[in-house]
């Protein structure tokens, strides 16, 4: 009988561990600039040029502008990386921003940097704001203004009335400035809020959305930003109507705060 020699033992080889591939930032962080436009044909080209120089795509929302302004927007939208959305009639700054946020998401962007078309925002801070947004993708990256001598004193002092109401309506000092529109929105949670609640469509929008995002515990990061009011700048603030809308907005938020007061106070005690 033939005897079979046993096979030599097989030396076990260590199994190499494979680290999971980390997602490339470019795969999930896709920011754009969102610019609501209403008859800003003089200042808009320079704003778009500065943002495109930073390699940031731009979504222009024409909020019922004049034919002259619409022509400028059409010409800018011929550039690569510049998109436009047009409202047949003016809906107000808030309405333009809301439409722009939805359009940005439809185009595949993850975040939107809101920029005013009148040139008052210091765009040298774009890179810093986007860097912070990539580090904290769920946070709203909010600018709080550093004014120069060009700021109208009446407008500056009037802001403090809104600051006080925001602090009351959040039971917190966390929101440093709710009126500066230079901020980066994470689109997913922002649009989820806009799908649930109808917010103000005009000058009341910037403040109301921050208060409601605070209520839902959305993280916020605050960065200083320089603000300059051009001597020939275009303002569409309507003294009586917009102040009435802002007052009504504060009243709505106050009622909402009363309903949420136990939760808001409990949140403060936990910190």
Predicted regions and their residues:
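Hydrophobic helical membrane-anchoring modules
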Residues: 2-28, 196-271
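Short, well-formed alpha-helical segments that are part of the catalytic scaffolds
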Residues: 17-22, 38-53
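Acidic helix N-cap motif at the loop->helix transition within catalytic regions
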Residues: 42-46, 67-76, 124
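A conserved acidic beta->alpha catalytic loop
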Residues: 62-71, 119
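Acceptor/aglycone-binding surface of glycosyltransferases and processive sugar-polymer synthases
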Residues: 89, 94-106, 123-203, 230-237, ...
